[in-house]
């Protein structure tokens, strides 16, 4: 396992930046270990899988979790507003960093993650391949 850490600055898109980092570093399989910071614009998909909400108010990143691959990332976040009310959902593009966001990722050397369309869900779902002796195809 390899650990990656990087910092985002004001105006950067949280999701796009994580996805670009994964591609740039050729991370075939990984997870988010930690994400802290503040957003001034939030864009989340709700649990119904359809509704997307955009909120133009400051929110602290309370937690983030997700699977990472060069084939796509699946990330959920919990966010707290100025009244300490917490919301959460599926991270979409246009979650914009206010001041900073500190991201720590773990990369696995014994797995390869990819995504394939699943007709039963309507989404590109995670496909997990275990790599024996750290030898990739």
Give names to the regions the model predicted:
Residues 1-74, 79-137:
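N-terminal intrinsically disordered, cationic/polar leader segments
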């Amino acid at each position: 396992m390899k650990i990656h850490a990087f910092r985002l600055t004001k105006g950067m898109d949280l999701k796009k930046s994580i996805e670009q980092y994964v591609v740039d570093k050729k991370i075939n399989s990984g997870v988010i270990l930690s994400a802290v910071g503040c957003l001034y614009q939030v864009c989340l998909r709700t649990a119904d899988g359809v509704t997307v909400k955009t909120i133009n108010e400051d929110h602290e990143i309370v937690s983030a979790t997700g699977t990472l691959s060069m084939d796509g990332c699946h990330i959920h976040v919990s966010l707290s507003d100025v009244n300490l009310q917490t919301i959460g959902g599926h991270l979409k593009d246009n979650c914009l960093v206010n001041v900073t966001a500190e991201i720590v990722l773990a990369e696995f050397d014994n797995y390869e993650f990819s995504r394939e369309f699943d007709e039963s869900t309507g989404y590109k779902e995670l496909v997990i391949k275990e790599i024996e002796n750290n030898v990739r195809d």
